[in-house]
Amino acid sequence: MGKAAAVVLVTLVALLGLAQADLTPKVQVYSRFPASAGTKNVLNCFAAGFHPPKISITLMKDGVPMEGAQYSDMSFNDDWTFQRLVHADFTPSSGSTYACKVEHETLKEPQVYKWDPEF
């Protein structure tokens, strides 16, 4: 009985450890409407599937943080990973680069995800 209890205990500890595993965010950068230079739009950065919940998401224009970014409340999925949406109004111009910078403890360094406007 002692061995069986030890096996159960080790299994439970392993499962708890897996439930709290650090998971890297999956990031999507997209606009609300099809891109058109000079036309008002909304730039979105959606990060999902990450754990732990502490994350920094910054919308960038030409490497500089964009003003007016709005952050949705942090929410979690059925598997206890987290997700967050950051968005800002903007008017795309053909000479500018738009991106989303994400910092999370599972990343060795901040990652920059560029928006592809497909003008």
Swiss-Prot record:
<dbReference type="GO" id="GO:1990712">
    <property type="term" value="C:HFE-transferrin receptor complex"/>
</dbReference>
<dbReference type="GO" id="GO:0050870">
    <property type="term" value="P:positive regulation of T cell activation"/>
</dbReference>
<keyword id="KW-1015">Disulfide bond</keyword>
<dbReference type="InterPro" id="IPR007110">
    <property type="entry name" value="Ig-like_dom"/>
</dbReference>
<dbReference type="GO" id="GO:0050680">
    <property type="term" value="P:negative regulation of epithelial cell proliferation"/>
</dbReference>
<feature type="signal peptide">
    <location>
        <begin position="1"/>
        <end position="21"/>
    </location>
</feature>
<keyword id="KW-0391">Immunity</keyword>
<feature type="domain" description="Ig-like C1-type">
    <location>
        <begin position="25"/>
        <end position="113"/>
    </location>
</feature>
<comment type="subunit">
    <text>Heterodimer of an alpha chain and a beta chain. Beta-2-microglobulin is the beta-chain of major histocompatibility complex class I molecules.</text>
</comment>
<dbReference type="GO" id="GO:0042803">
    <property type="term" value="F:protein homodimerization activity"/>
</dbReference>
<dbReference type="GO" id="GO:0002503">
    <property type="term" value="P:peptide antigen assembly with MHC class II protein complex"/>
</dbReference>
<dbReference type="GO" id="GO:2000978">
    <property type="term" value="P:negative regulation of forebrain neuron differentiation"/>
</dbReference>
<dbReference type="GO" id="GO:0002726">
    <property type="term" value="P:positive regulation of T cell cytokine production"/>
</dbReference>
<dbReference type="GO" id="GO:0048260">
    <property type="term" value="P:positive regulation of receptor-mediated endocytosis"/>
</dbReference>
<comment type="function">
    <text>Component of the class I major histocompatibility complex (MHC). Involved in the presentation of peptide antigens to the immune system.</text>
</comment>
<dbReference type="GO" id="GO:0019886">
    <property type="term" value="P:antigen processing and presentation of exogenous peptide antigen via MHC class II"/>
</dbReference>
<dbReference type="GO" id="GO:0042612">
    <property type="term" value="C:MHC class I protein complex"/>
</dbReference>
<dbReference type="GO" id="GO:0031902">
    <property type="term" value="C:late endosome membrane"/>
</dbReference>
<dbReference type="GO" id="GO:0071281">
    <property type="term" value="P:cellular response to iron ion"/>
</dbReference>
<dbReference type="GO" id="GO:0007611">
    <property type="term" value="P:learning or memory"/>
</dbReference>
<dbReference type="InterPro" id="IPR036179">
    <property type="entry name" value="Ig-like_dom_sf"/>
</dbReference>
<dbReference type="GO" id="GO:0005794">
    <property type="term" value="C:Golgi apparatus"/>
</dbReference>
<dbReference type="GO" id="GO:0050768">
    <property type="term" value="P:negative regulation of neurogenesis"/>
</dbReference>
<dbReference type="InterPro" id="IPR015707">
    <property type="entry name" value="B2Microglobulin"/>
</dbReference>
<dbReference type="GO" id="GO:0023026">
    <property type="term" value="F:MHC class II protein complex binding"/>
</dbReference>
<dbReference type="InterPro" id="IPR003597">
    <property type="entry name" value="Ig_C1-set"/>
</dbReference>
<dbReference type="GO" id="GO:0051289">
    <property type="term" value="P:protein homotetramerization"/>
</dbReference>
<dbReference type="InterPro" id="IPR003006">
    <property type="entry name" value="Ig/MHC_CS"/>
</dbReference>
<dbReference type="Pfam" id="PF07654">
    <property type="entry name" value="C1-set"/>
</dbReference>
<dbReference type="GO" id="GO:0005198">
    <property type="term" value="F:structural molecule activity"/>
</dbReference>
<feature type="disulfide bond">
    <location>
        <begin position="45"/>
        <end position="100"/>
    </location>
</feature>
<dbReference type="GO" id="GO:0006879">
    <property type="term" value="P:intracellular iron ion homeostasis"/>
</dbReference>
<dbReference type="GO" id="GO:2000774">
    <property type="term" value="P:positive regulation of cellular senescence"/>
</dbReference>
<dbReference type="InterPro" id="IPR013783">
    <property type="entry name" value="Ig-like_fold"/>
</dbReference>
<dbReference type="GO" id="GO:0005576">
    <property type="term" value="C:extracellular region"/>
</dbReference>
<dbReference type="GO" id="GO:0019885">
    <property type="term" value="P:antigen processing and presentation of endogenous peptide antigen via MHC class I"/>
</dbReference>
<dbReference type="GO" id="GO:0005829">
    <property type="term" value="C:cytosol"/>
</dbReference>
<keyword id="KW-0490">MHC I</keyword>
<dbReference type="GO" id="GO:0042613">
    <property type="term" value="C:MHC class II protein complex"/>
</dbReference>
<dbReference type="GO" id="GO:0071316">
    <property type="term" value="P:cellular response to nicotine"/>
</dbReference>
<protein>
    <recommendedName>
        <fullName>Beta-2-microglobulin</fullName>
    </recommendedName>
</protein>
<keyword id="KW-0964">Secreted</keyword>
